[in-house]
């Protein structure tokens, strides 16, 4: 559930950023709203990511290292979302 919500936040941020960029010359006020929403979605993503990190840290403290499969999945998911977040941040930051 948490991973799906993180993906949803990034997807929303990407969509809002694209709308902002598309509309910035046509309707600046609406574009500004979309840019603000994109930043808010990125903030939501960051809060969820912080919770995922907390959960994983607590798991390691209580149970020791994760299984190899779980660690691989965690690393893959982290890399995927970090790359996606970087892409979305570029979109958001390109809006001026």
Per-range role (PLM):
Residues 1-96:
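Non-heme di-metal
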């Amino acid at each position: 559930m948490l991973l799906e919500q993180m993906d949803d936040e990034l997807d929303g941020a990407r969509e809002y950023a694209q709308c902002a960029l598309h509309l910035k010359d046509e309707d600046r006020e609406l574009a500004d709203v979309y840019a603000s929403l994109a930043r808010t979605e990125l903030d939501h993503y960051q809060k969820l990511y912080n919770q995922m990190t907390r959960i994983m840290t607590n798991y390691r403290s209580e149970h020791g290292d994760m299984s190899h499969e779980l660690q691989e999945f965690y690393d893959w998911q982290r890399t995927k979302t970090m790359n996606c977040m970087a892409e979305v941040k570029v979109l958001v930051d390109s809006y001026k």
